[in-house]
């Protein structure tokens, strides 16, 4: 059972849990960079991954919005890697052990990597979503799909 599966918004926490499976300390971002690239390719999104691991994913506007100004969502992929002195966690290869303690998402004996891990998860949830407006404009009473 996924630790975060009952949290809302579901897609955000789903992707955050997946991201937490990938070691992503500073200067160790190849795995998370590859994960983000695969995410985009699996959804037929335009993606560029450069030689240092930066990833840019583009999703076209929906019907009626093809020529609208783009929206940029940004988050860094790495995390601060700190652990309790008695922890055997190896940030170069071990996934984070997520837990819910007193209603808060935490990682067992380590930092959570939540500051921008959640930014990545939110961006991925939006890129994965069908909740994008189509023509006509939502101001005209259109529904989202």
Walk through the language-model features, giving the residues of each.
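Flexible, small-residue-rich helix->loop connector segments that border functional cores
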Residues: 125-132
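Acidic/His- and Gly-rich active-site-bordering loop/insert found
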Residues: 4-102
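Conserved small/polar residues in nucleotide/adenosyl-binding loops
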Residues: 133-140
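Catalytic-loop motifs flanking and including active-site residues across diverse enzymes
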Residues: 115-122
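Short pre-catalytic strand/loop immediately N-terminal to key active-site residues, enriched for Gly-Thr
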Residues: 106-112
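N-terminal low-complexity segments that are often proline-rich with Ser/Thr-Pro
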Residues: 142-145
């Amino acid at each position: 059972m996924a630790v975060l599966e009952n949290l809302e918004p579901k897609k955000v926490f789903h992707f955050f849990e997946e991201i937490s499976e990938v070691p992503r300390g500073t200067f160790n971002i190849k795995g998370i960079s590859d994960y983000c690239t695969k995410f985009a390719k699996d959804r037929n999104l335009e993606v560029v991954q450069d030689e240092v691991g930066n990833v840019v994913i583009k999703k076209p506007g929906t019907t009626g919005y093809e020529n609208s100004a783009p929206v940029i969502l940004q988050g860094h992929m790495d995390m601060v890697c700190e652990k309790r002195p008695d922890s055997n966690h190896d940030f170069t290869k071990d996934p984070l052990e997520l837990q819910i303690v007193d209603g808060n998402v935490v990682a067992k004996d380590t930092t959570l990597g939540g500051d921008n891990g959640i930014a990545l998860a939110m961006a991925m949830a939006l890129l994965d979503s069908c909740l994008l407006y189509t023509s006509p404009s939502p101001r005209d009473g259109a529904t989202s799909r």
